[in-house]
Amino acid sequence: MAEPRWVERLVVEAVHLDQLREHGGLSGLRDENALESALARAHQKWQYDSRARFPELVAASGFGIARNHPYRDGNKRTGFLAMAIFAGLNGYALDATDAEVVTVMLGLAAGHLNEQELADWLTSHLARSK
């Protein structure tokens, strides 16, 4: 697989701030290392796991944000949008209802859904953009 286009930290930070403005929540970074780790997760998977499929990279791009809680608030929203942006940058769109997204992201943040299960869900919800 050719190297994907990655979501930059500044984009994730802008998305996070936008979500807080739109939906409310506590601002601020809770854990710098958790954010750095979350942002590097997909790239590390691509670099060191030659069998990684694109949905697994998408899952990795949001998993660390939703699960590691680098921000004081808005981690699930930011994690989901990081996945959607990453997919979009690479020619894919996420096709899921709001209810499906909420269920998946709540399950992910609560530890009821692991990264591979998220990737499996994404496999059936990613479509090539037109």
Give the positions of each predicted feature.
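FIC/Doc superfamily catalytic core
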Residues: 1-130
